[in-house]
Amino acid sequence: MVTSFKDDDYVVFPLIPYSPLETDLISTDEKSTAKHILGTDGTGRDIMSRMIHGSRVSLSVGFVAVGISLTIGIILGALAGYYGGWVDNLIQRLIEIVICFPTFFLILTITAFLPQNIFNIMIAIGIVGWTGVARLVRGEFLKLRSQDFVTAARAIGTPASRIIFRHILPNGLAPVFVSATFGVAGAILVESSLSFLGFGVPVPTPSWGQILSDGRTNYEMFVTLYPGIAIFLTVTSYNLVGEALRDALDPRLKI
């Protein structure tokens, strides 16, 4: 059964029993009950519904932002590693300019100048977080561009774009997968921090960081507890996946 509500597309029943925007002034600041499993906040909104909906927002920001940073980082890193010379120098200087600013401060500055919506948050995180991916891809290309299969491809006149994206890139993606898992965790933390400070997902759309901020503002301990636990467990899980992928894919750790 699918039901719709204001400022959202859909919710899936019964996972989200109430609209995350629905208020019930009779049931404000309730603890856990049969009707409201995780209780309600100061305006009577069901915390469980807001948490489930907030997970979609926070995870969407994480995945899309990492997708943007991977796209930028892979393209620029591949060009720098394959061509070298002035192309490499130009991209390296661009990377140095970006990383000379504190990451969170740069993202906060970008979001302050953009209209406040979830897509601009994804873009801001994505266009700042690509430098690590670019360096990883560049390093892999520097190692692989002198291999025999690349030399053979050049000898038969294969276009550079095909060599880069069809021959070299698939052989150098292993460290990128590891970086992506850490990137998702980092993006979720950044989005939560932005929402906590009031620069994230616009009100009233719930995200974990915004729920955390609401609980702090109204001095509601249990409202802050649940999103805090969710953020901690999600970020820890992605970091553990990243560690496992690194252990499995990095040949240097098998020596």
Question: Model regions: which residues?
Answer:
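Gly/Trp-centered helix-boundary motif
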Residues: 1-70, 74, 78-79, 187, ...
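Transmembrane alpha-helices
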Residues: 56-72, 142, 161-193, 238
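Generic hydrophobic transmembrane alpha-helix motif, especially the helices
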Residues: 35-41, 45-47, 58-147, 175-177
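Glycine-rich helix-loop "coupling/hinge" segments at transmembrane-helix boundaries
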Residues: 99, 110-115, 125-126, 140-141, ...
